Amino acid sequence: MGQKINPLGFRLGITQNHRSYWFANKKYSKVFEEDKKIRDCIELYVQKHIKNSSNYGGIARVEIKRKTDLIQVEIYTGFPALLVESRGQGIEQLKLNVQNILSSEDRRLRMTLIEIAKPYGEPKILAKKIALKLESRVAFRRTMKKAIELAKKGNIKGIKIQIAGRLNGAEIARVEWAREGRVPLQTIRARINYCYYAAQTIYGVLGIKVWIFQDEE
């Protein structure tokens, strides 16, 4: 079962925490949709303004905490300085964009940038970097090898990368993967982070999956 199920949901409440902290009764679907819009707004802003930065670490995750009159958004990123333009205009513009999609104006919005010490130890950041390379028509084996080298700098215990689709423009789609170290998917106490990301290439969509084994509790 551990081989097929989503590693994050499998370990939720044990080694993984929720990404949203709030309670809603009748308004659950509305609040859930609002969280989705907030995350999409942040991702869109980053892709639009900072995608061309060669050393940008990307966004690892966005955590949303709600109170009666306060929405707190915490953005975990590899290089927060690249999100903060001159005099903090970058984060202020992002905050304004998020405020515009909120259904109620009487709630305060607090946005915080949290720096990740070793960004390439985060699967989402690594998967997006792989996608950028594949979309630039870099060979997939070379891309996977380079990604593993970057991840190993983050003091991880194991990593597995899988890419599926028309690799290198082949007529028949296939699946290729590479692994370094241990990735015990069936061990619940193992802290394994996971991400799926789709790369849009000229040959079609390539599915990228990244598993990173941090440590055991």
Swiss-Prot record:
> Which GO molecular function annotations are given, in alphabetical order?
rRNA binding; structural constituent of ribosome
| GO biological process entries | translation
At the top level, the lineage of the source is Eukaryota
State one Pfam family annotation: Ribosomal_S3_C
Q: SUPFAM superfamilies from the entry?
A: Prokaryotic type KH domain (KH-domain type II), Ribosomal protein S3 C-terminal domain
Location relative to the cell: Plastid, Chloroplast
InterPro entries named among the record's database cross-references: KH_dom-like_a/b, KH_dom_type_2, KH_sf_prok-type, Ribosomal_S3_C_sf, Ribosomal_uS3_bac-typ, Ribosomal_uS3_C, Ribosomal_uS3_CS
- Gene3D superfamilies associated with the record: 3.30.300.20, Ribosomal protein S3, C-terminal domain
Q: Does the keyword Ribonucleoprotein apply?
A: yes
Arranged from A to Z, the UniProt key words for this protein are: Chloroplast, Plastid, Ribonucleoprotein, Ribosomal protein, RNA-binding, rRNA-binding
Q: Output the Gene Ontology cellular-component terms.
A: chloroplast; ribonucleoprotein complex; ribosome
KH type-2 domain span: 46-117
Which HAMAP family does the entry link to? Ribosomal_uS3_B
Q: So what family is this one in?
A: Belongs to the universal ribosomal protein uS3 family.
* Subunit: Part of the 30S ribosomal subunit.
**UniProt name for this protein:** Small ribosomal subunit protein uS3c
